[in-house]
Amino acid sequence: MTAILERRESTSLWGRFCNWITSTENRLYIGWFGVLMIPTLLTATSVFIIAFIAAPPVDIDGIREPVSGSLLYGNNIISGAIIPTSAAIGLHFYPIWEAASVDEWLYNGGPYELIVLHFLLGVACYMGREWELSFRLGMRPWIAVAYSAPVAAATAVFLIYPIGQGSFSDGMPLGISGTFNFMIVFQAEHNILMHPFHMLGVAGVFGGSLFSAMHGSLVTSSLIRETTENESANEGYKFGQEEETYNIVAAHGYFGRLIFQYASFNNSRSLHFFLAAWPVVGIWFTALGISTMAFNLNGFNFNQSVVDSQGRVINTWADIINRANLGMEVMHERNAHNFPLDLAAVEVPSING
């Protein structure tokens, strides 16, 4: 009798690390994208929390007029924000070691750039991690594609727009009131409400909410009865069960009679594709709109487009919006400009001597 002994190859430390990183048995999947995602998102989150609580005022406009954004400097949850990096820094890469001191770095809004750049890297890696986990499990890749919409939107307001405008000081502040301020100034300078891509984004977000509510209510209203009146309808579903938990034929029949036959999906797969694609495409277009307006390709201008036979202007809603835009324009960054650009661009009437 001959015994054959095989020597088991010992896996290297690197090999075990690779197996652990790419294992789908972990409670939370890490993946190669996660190796970069975890430190970048932890850094962005940590600095955000510290700066939101304790960062000193920032000279956002580069005119020696610091703006307070943290809780310890007089703000609350609504008014507080991470103030964007100073206009004096512009688009320069501004890590801590580029400043003469930490005080100077804080005064010039260094934390904003640190948070934004780490955050964008982190969410991009999160998207890659979604694809990676789908790939490992043999799933289709559309979860990551759907997530690309909010990633594109965040990249547009935090990176593309500052690049187009020439300074990180024009990026969106990281706070509630700061977000509203960004929206108001964006409307004043770019007339975003009159941009078709923003309109598509509104249709995507509101339409997505409507379709989500319609789908959820239709499914909930056509559940197959599995319980008595004395227990929750949710008890009628067991995780992983093979049979349908609702009657799609009944839901299709109801909605087809409520609207008309062809307004109702009779294919569950095409229905769920539509529910995913509608808001995603809308938000893609909004991100594209922000990215084009970043380089001053602005919304439609229909100002003073209707005149009477005497040449007098008959105001339309476009003129009302324009008047609001001018008001917002003259009020923002009020000490940074000698005269607002939009008003200064108007041709001065000639005076006959």
From Swiss-Prot:
InterPro entries: D1/D2, Photo_II_D1/D2_sf, Photo_RC_L/M, Photo_RC_L/M_CS, PSII_D1. The record marks H190 as: Stabilizes free radical intermediate. It is found in: Plastid, Chloroplast thylakoid membrane. A quinone binds at H215, S264, F265. It catalyses: 2 a plastoquinone + 4 hnu + 2 H2O = 2 a plastoquinol + O2. The chain crosses the membrane at residues 29-46, 118-133, 142-156, 197-218, 274-288. Signal peptide: none annotated. The keyword Cytoplasm does not apply. The modification N-acetylthreonine is found at T2. The gene is psbA. Photosystem II (PSII) is a light-driven water:plastoquinone oxidoreductase that uses light energy to abstract electrons from H(2)O, generating O(2) and a proton gradient subsequently used for ATP formation. It consists of a core antenna complex that captures photons, and an electron transfer chain that converts photonic excitation into a charge separation. The D1/D2 (PsbA/PsbD) reaction center heterodimer binds P680, the primary electron donor of PSII as well as several subsequent electron acceptors. This is Photosystem II protein D1. Its EC number is 1.10.3.9. It comes from Secale cereale. Chlorophyll a ChlzD1 binds at H118. The D1/D2 heterodimer binds P680, chlorophylls that are the primary electron donor of PSII, and subsequent electron acceptors. It shares a non-heme iron and each subunit binds pheophytin, quinone, additional chlorophylls, carotenoids and lipids. D1 provides most of the ligands for the Mn4-Ca-O5 cluster of the oxygen-evolving complex (OEC). There is also a Cl(-1) ion associated with D1 and D2, which is required for oxygen evolution. The PSII complex binds additional chlorophylls, carotenoids and specific lipids. Keywords: Acetylation, Calcium, Chlorophyll, Chloroplast, Chromophore, Electron transport, Herbicide resistance, Iron, Magnesium, Manganese, Membrane, Metal-binding, Oxidoreductase, Phosphoprotein, Photosynthesis, Photosystem II, Plastid, Thylakoid, Transmembrane, Transmembrane helix, Transport.
